[in-house]
């Protein structure tokens, strides 16, 4: 009978593995978007001795440098001893950030509730995204070029938003569907408010927000 990797490790290796797993989980938890991943990766490579390529005037064998592309890609290099025409060793990875993105004008009111209109990105299982707390994470670029980082939901004291689901007593039709259809993409709108503004007739909840 085959053994798992865990069964083959000694106690010291198990401790090392658990520490690696914790650091990996912590990294993913704060790297929900490509931009966040790149920013956090910069901190890691700089800690490992890499320097920003734009700040280096001369390269020699053994130098460690990195470069980013529009804040959404990162390349890290260790300069070798031989000319690049002789080849290079390359490791590549895709920054995958499955998520629901806000549409251009997302805020709308329906049946006394205010929601954010979304479209999903990546190969997500849509039913996994309902009835759980979510964070609003991203970047806003103002007309004057000012960049504002947004992160609402990661801190325990932040407001909580989420995608609502049907109660089991109302979900007979839903439960008969396949996993791909049990929650449709158009149903992934985020609930953000239900308190109406006083003395407002049209879209009072939206007006309050």
Q: Where are the regions a protein language model picked out?
A:
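N-terminal hydrophobic/helix-forming segments and targeting peptides
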Residues: 1-209
